[in-house]
Regions:
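A conserved mid-protein helix/loop that constitutes part of the nucleotide-sugar donor-binding site
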Residues: 22, 208-231, 237, 241, ...
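Carbohydrate-associated surface elements
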Residues: 44, 161, 181
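Short alpha-helical donor nucleotide-sugar binding micro-motif in glycosyltransferases
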Residues: 149, 271, 279-285
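Nucleotide-activated donor-binding/catalytic signature segment of Leloir-type glycosyltransferases, i.e.
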Residues: 254-272
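A short, well-ordered alpha-helix in the C-terminal region of glycosyltransferases
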Residues: 265, 352-366, 370, 377
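Aromatic "clamp/platform" in nucleotide-sugar-dependent glycosyltransferases that forms part
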Residues: 293
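Short hydrophobic beta-strand element within catalytic cores of glycosyltransferases
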Residues: 310-314
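Conserved acidic donor-binding segment of nucleotide-sugar-dependent glycosyltransferases
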Residues: 325-326, 330-336, 345-350
Length: 448
């Protein structure tokens, strides 16, 4: 298969880490290693060092809002960025975010003459609802998001559930399910590695160990876990529960553990960045508890499966796609009673947990190498369709575009001093694009 130069865009990238940033890193590394050349375009972050990456990282101007929201707000018009991408001879643009990165990708498309693919990773309507209380602003932001999605030549989603969420926002076009992979190898770690990673925790042999890995946010189903564990203890069942991760609700979660008198059986490790240490915890656990309906692509479920740890999931959730109850995972209803009943049955059948874990390792695991190979095959289809003129022409930016995108960036910024300034943001979007377009035209004219 021919090798191509792919430009990957996202609003977050190391040193800012989240699931989508991790996906972009793995896309870029595997494209560079196996399929051609990758270029990453992302907002500038003070102090970021990109020298260790085996591919170029192009940073565009941003506002540092990490202290308030944990992210930088990218300013998506930059003639320097456009010229740099043009110099890389980019053949396809792939944005992993429908906000600033999508706006930038839409403007770059005019410069590099390349098709634009978007991957929809997460339920942005929930993020928008958390960011702003104004119903009108929420609706305007969602319209802008859908506008960006509609402007792409091809839309990918990480799961069927992600596609359904996108449909619920008003998107009516086609989409392709393109699953993400995991960056851990298949197989359990050694007993010595498990002992080293878990030293200091009260984890008796023969006592079931349950595990949660992810952001400590209530919407991840943590109330269901804690209420089920309380009921399990009241039944006289011994167990241990380990929470790995951090998050905005961590203090409340810890307090609830104390209130429910579970602190002698529930432990918090904080975030664990080392992948081998994380593999050791997956290898030690009997069950991975993930009763979340928020996540569009439960990569942690596949991480657990890589180490032979079966998951307990909500029936019909995105994380449960591909899971058959009692075969390669366990399914419950979205309530603590159902989870407690499942845990009670499984604590009495440790062999079932082991057997289902082995099946999960064989059937659910997907490496990033295989995931990006699938994406690369689809890139070839997109390029062929684009070069054959099979994609419709897209409209140039309009006044409505600048108005709605101002609302979207306002909503997603979640920065107090930027609230109520949609007019300024709209003007800056309009002025920024006009200035960038003129500057780019001047530079291109000089080159030609």
């Amino acid at each position: 298969m021919d090798k191509h130069t792919i430009c990957l865009l996202n609003d977050s990238f190391p040193p800012i880490i989240d699931g989508v940033a991790n996906a972009v890193v793995n896309y870029a590394e595997n494209i560079e290693k196996h399929h051609g050349h990758a270029v990453v375009v992302t907002p500038a972050v003070p102090g970021a060092d990109d020298s260790g990456f085996p591919f170029p990282v192009v940073r565009y101007p941003s506002i540092d809002t990490r202290r308030l929201v944990g992210y930088v707000a990218g300013y998506p018009f930059s003639p320097e960025t456009a010229l740099r991408v043009r110099e890389e001879k980019v053949e396809l643009l792939h944005t992993h975010c429908p906000i600033a990165s999508a706006i930038l990708a839409r403007s770059l498309r005019e410069v590099v003459d390349a098709p634009l693919v978007l991957t929809y990773h997460t339920k942005y309507d929930i993020d928008i609802a958390k960011a702003v209380k104004s119903r009108l602003l929420q609706e305007s932001a969602i319209r802008a998001l859908v506008q960006n999605v509609n402007a792409c030549d091809e839309v990918w989603v990480v799961s069927r559930g992600a596609g359904e969420n996108l449909r619920s926002l008003g998107y009516e076009g086609a989409y392709t399910v393109m699953e993400n992979g995991v960056d851990v190898p298949r197989g359990r770690v050694s007993a010595a590695a498990v002992a080293a990673a878990t030293v200091g925790y009260d984890l008796p042999d023969g006592v079931p160990l349950f595990l949660f890995v992810g952001r400590l946010m209530w919407y991840k189903g943590l109330h269901i876990i804690l209420d089920a564990l309380r009921a399990l203890r009241e039944q006289g069942q011994d167990f241990r529960m380990v929470f790995i991760g951090a998050g905005g609700d961590e203090k409340e979660v810890r307090a609830e553990v104390e209130t429910l008198r579970l602190s002698d059986r529930c432990f918090f490790t904080g975030s664990i960045a080392d992948r081998e240490t994380l593999r050791a915890w997956y290898s030690r656990a009997d069950l991975f508890l993930f009763p979340s309906t928020f996540d569009t692509n439960g990569l942690v479920v596949r991480e657990a499966a890589a180490s032979g740890c079966p998951s307990v999931l909500i029936v019909g959730s995105c994380a449960a796609e591909g899971v058959t109850d009692g075969r390669n995972g366990f399914l419950i209803e979205e309530n603590a009673v159902s989870l407690c009943a499942k845990l009670t049955a499984l604590c009495a059948d440790r062999e079932a947990m082991r057997r289902v874990g082995e099946n999960a390792m064989r059937e659910l695991y997907l490496s990033w190498e295989d995931a990006v190979a699938r994406a690369n095959e689809r890139y070839a289809v997109v390029l062929d369709r684009y070069r054959s003129g099979k994609y419709p022409k897209h409209e140039r930016f309009s006044d409505e575009f600048f108005n709605t995108q101002g609302d979207l960036m306002e909503a997603m910024s979640r920065v107090a001093e930027m609230r109520g300034e949609t007019g300024r943001l709209r003007r800056e979007l309009r002025e920024g694009f006009d200035e960038a377009r003129e500057a780019l035209r001047e530079k291109l004219e000089k080159e030609w």
